[in-house]
């Protein structure tokens, strides 16, 4: 491992390890009572919870498969691999968290786990991600030519900028907004930890993409730039459709039009993070509290159940 070529990758591995958490540490009692009471949640709120658990339980498996079957094999730098292994563990924890929520709330598992086949707005997102992992997950796929190197780059953009960087944001915002209104606070706390992990995954992926561009400038030609921008725009459109489908009437403090603006704001960020121009002019962030959660550091979380920045693994420095 030493000397490190990419200090940023090792630092993210250390930070991710220090932020370790497990789903069963979070109390789900209030969520269970609320979910089972007849007038606890509106039908629209129930739809939001079920759709998101259905999408996320499938999506994190998709991300984990891509990491283990493709990226770990194709990215050979030791400290980047170390972080990819850390991320793989976190994806397993996230899948565990969704399962824990589904079981705690006594949901119909068949209904939830089949959404990626039966609910069109969920299915479209899952199949969009699959098309970018299919070829590079093949054990015979090798990088080393301009064409295959570009395929790897497209996979990184698809999974880090779009799947984790856009497809997760409507659902995170919906669930965390419910938590802010003191509804489904256990589920929202699980999602808060997951969002913190996912933010680091996205940052790692963007660092890898930008490092590949620096070391292989010939890959980042006009055609590739146009394709990368197109992928981010396609992902944004799919997520806007998902927002409209999960919020046909809106819920307190949030509706599909606000979510559309937020997703365009996020898309602009993803574009600029990989060196492309913003595509949506004049959009702002209608949910500034989301940025506060993503950037939360060393303070008690807004559900006041436990310290969000609690760390394990000897990461505290004693004076």
Protein language model features and the residues they cover:
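Amphipathic alpha-helical packing elements
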Residues: 1-36
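Non-heme di-metal
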Residues: 38, 42-319
């Amino acid at each position: 491992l030493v000397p490190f070529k990419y200090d940023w990758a090792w630092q993210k591995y250390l930070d991710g390890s220090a932020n370790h958490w497990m789903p069963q540490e979070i109390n789900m009692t209030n969520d269970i009572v609320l979910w089972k009471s007849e007038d606890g949640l509106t039908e629209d709120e129930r739809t939001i919870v079920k759709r998101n658990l259905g999408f996320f339980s499938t999506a994190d498996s998709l991300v984990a498969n891509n990491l283990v079957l493709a990226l770990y094999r194709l990215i050979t730098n030791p400290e980047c691999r170390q972080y990819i292994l850390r991320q793989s563990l976190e994806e397993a924890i996230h899948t565990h968290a969704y399962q824990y929520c589904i079981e705690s709330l006594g949901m119909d598992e068949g209904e939830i786990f089949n959404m990626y086949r039966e609910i069109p707005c969920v299915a479209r997102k899952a199949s969009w991600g699959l098309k970018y992992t299919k070829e590079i997950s093949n054990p015979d796929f090798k990088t080393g030519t301009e064409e295959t190197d570009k395929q790897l780059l497209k996979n990184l953009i698809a999974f880090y900028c779009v799947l984790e960087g856009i497809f997760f944001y409507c659902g995170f915002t919906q669930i965390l907004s419910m938590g802010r209104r003191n509804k489904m606070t256990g589920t929202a706390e699980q999602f808060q930890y997951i969002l913190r992990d996912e933010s680091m995954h996205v940052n790692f992926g963007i660092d890898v993409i930008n490092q590949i561009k620096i070391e292989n400038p010939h890959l980042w030609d006009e055609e590739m730039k146009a394709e990368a921008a197109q992928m981010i725009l396609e992902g944004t459109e799919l997520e806007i459709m998902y927002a409209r489908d999960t919020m046909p009437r809106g819920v307190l403090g949030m509706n599909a039009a606000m979510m559309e603006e937020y997703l365009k704001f996020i898309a602009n960020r993803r574009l600029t993070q990989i060196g492309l121009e913003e595509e949506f002019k004049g959009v702002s962030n209608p949910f500034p509290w989301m940025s506060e959660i993503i950037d939360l550091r060393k303070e008690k979380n807004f559900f006041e159940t436990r310290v969000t920045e609690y760390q394990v693994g000897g990461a505290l420095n004693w004076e």
